[in-house]
Amino acid sequence: MGRSGRHDATMTPPPPSNDLHDAFSADFEHELRFTRSVLDPSNPLLRDLVGWSDRGPRPGLIAVVDSGLHAANPGLPEAIERRFDDPGLPELRETIIVPGGETAKNDPAVVETVLSAIDTHRIDRRSLVAVFGGGAVIDAVGFAASTAHRGVRLVRFASTVLAQLDAAIGVKNGINRFGKKNFIGCFDVPVAVVCDEVMLETLSDRDWRSGFSEAVKIACLKDADYLDLIENNADRIRERDPDASRPVIRRCAELHLHHITRGGDPFERAEARPLDFGHWSAHRLESITDFAVTHGEAVSIGIALDTMYSHLVDRIERAEADRVIDVLKRLGLPVHHEALHGEAILAGIEEFREHLGGRLTITLLDGIGRPVDVHEIDPEVVTRAADLLS
Amino acid sequence: MGRSGRHDATMTPPPPSNDLHDAFSADFEHELRFTRSVLDPSNPLLRDLVGWSDRGPRPGLIAVVDSGLHAANPGLPEAIERRFDDPGLPELRETIIVPGGETAKNDPAVVETVLSAIDTHRIDRRSLVAVFGGGAVIDAVGFAASTAHRGVRLVRFASTVLAQLDAAIGVKNGINRFGKKNFIGCFDVPVAVVCDEVMLETLSDRDWRSGFSEAVKIACLKDADYLDLIENNADRIRERDPDASRPVIRRCAELHLHHITRGGDPFERAEARPLDFGHWSAHRLESITDFAVTHGEAVSIGIALDTMYSHLVDRIERAEADRVIDVLKRLGLPVHHEALHGEAILAGIEEFREHLGGRLTITLLDGIGRPVDVHEIDPEVVTRAADLLS
């Protein structure tokens, strides 16, 4: 029928269908790059990742910097400015410093500031937000970027061990509300995650060490060989030897990436969240202590608790459980906290269930690299596990 | 290697890779249901869509109702309460009335109210938000639901023609900020979209008619036969004959659904947005007139303008352009507004570009069902097109 063809006015309309069901899929790409001195003008990485190819107007860019990173690297804003002088890259329109650590996720002003800068500088869906910082700042800034214009392009420059091997790899973001961690957030895939080794050099010893608990977690869940690698390098990692730390950080990032891209549930719609091993108590511990315990430390304690619990319910052998706990200690991480003994910690079980919804699903260990999901936790056994760790 | 196997301490770590790239895809399902009297306890649809199967705790539900819908149907909250008394459905925990129309998207209190209710009533990712209303309320409530716990389940009950054939079908949501339409939002797929014909019966004549401009738009873009169907039924549609309107509404919803699920770009990452035909001026017209023009009316005017523009740049024949404009008029829709003649309307071109980013991309018509993307708009031709419509 031609484009001016007409049906007769008496035609029967197509029978109306009551049910329209359609399945579809969407494709995503996840780029993760390790480098040194990404802002050095001789480093080609940024041109490779976000180079401007002269098609359409030159895109804009705003940079958002974690105050903690800025304090340790006062020259960073100038280095960012110098790098984006390059006409082959997006045009830098503003550099904003935002509070680092959990404040970034607790203070709604951080998201507001970034949204307002996106508006003021006309950052559109082809333009960029570049965030430089730790996991909390990346989470909060990422939420702003993902919701402005339904998603402007985000490049995450992960500046902590925790961010480089875990937090910045994920495809989610979020902020805290109503006193609950990550109450608000969404799933989104960044344009790229850049892990610059130089940024780790100015971390405090405490922040350096805090990151490696997530590596132990991934080893417990995914790869017994990887626990060997951590174990064999633990003392040198604690002493911040970059050659010992580098392969541990990269392998963790890779395992995390593959969990998302090859695990079959990138946007966490299934019941289980295996990567949250040790996290029910960790989240709660952070909030009970008003974040005096870092996330990495809380995760270390949470791993120790759920590993010992796994032993007490006859899953993992004592020698293996002790091995996990020993690695954490050798990395300079805590495996116990007084708050584990009170009633308050147990509220973390229900909070954890509620965030995910449906049945409680907690990951335990049948062995190293052999996770198992359970749907009940016995508070008395939690207390006994805490006692064994004290 | 057994689970307590160890590598030798002198082993060579795996060579660190600088670049980790992984592609992945995610699967989605889109459910669209047409029915009558969905809240009648004898209607099995809700049990079919969101029935509770006794696995895990009974999920919760909050209902959010558009004030416009509530004003026209004061018994609605009670009907919702009665329906969800059914133990085979989620448990209703609160029904909230929120301002209808564009106020829902302009007033940040609407999103806040819904987030706060999600927190108070412990609505988790397995629980539900049910929104009853027009496109604007569905957009704002959807944004809250999509970002709480990174997405609680949402069922959209579309109560207007515009929502049933267009707004509620999309996989996005959003609110206005900084005086810009949809500045904040995200992509998300609802659990289901329910179109209840009974809800349309209490619409004002103006709101009834406003919905059909999107049907003409879809016909212009996708399906010349569908324009025949609208044309042949236009007079009866204007008079609100349900038998003439039903197939037009359902076919539009179906074309819209297939655009999303089969068009290859469900989350609009490509440059073109063909479904936004006529929308650059429509969005601007709404904002210039402070929403005195409804979205559907503005879209009708925008379609007429871009169709006439297409003729003036030698794309569509005059007779075909006139046919589109005539259908709009016969549906009782406006095709002209005084504000089309000023400078102010032209700012809509840049606003439209900015929201999408990159090059300007405007859809014109080479014929009915034959859209074409262009990257430039001549302001003088816009003015001549407006003159021809006045």
Where are these regions (language model features)?
Chain A
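A glycine/threonine-rich phosphate-anchoring loop and its flanking beta-alpha core
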Residues: 142-236
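Active-site segments that bind and position negatively charged phosphate/pyrophosphate groups
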Residues: 232-343
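ATP/NTP phosphate-donor binding region
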Residues: 12-127
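C-terminal charged capping/lid subdomain of soluble metabolic enzymes
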Residues: 16-20, 25, 213-216, 315-390
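Solvent-exposed alpha-helices and their adjacent loops that cap or buttress functional pockets
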Residues: 55, 121-124, 147-149, 176-177, ...
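Short, Lys/Arg-enriched N-terminal segments with co-localized hydrophobic residues
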Residues: 2-10
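Active-site and donor-binding regions of nucleotide-sugar-utilizing enzymes
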Residues: 123-155
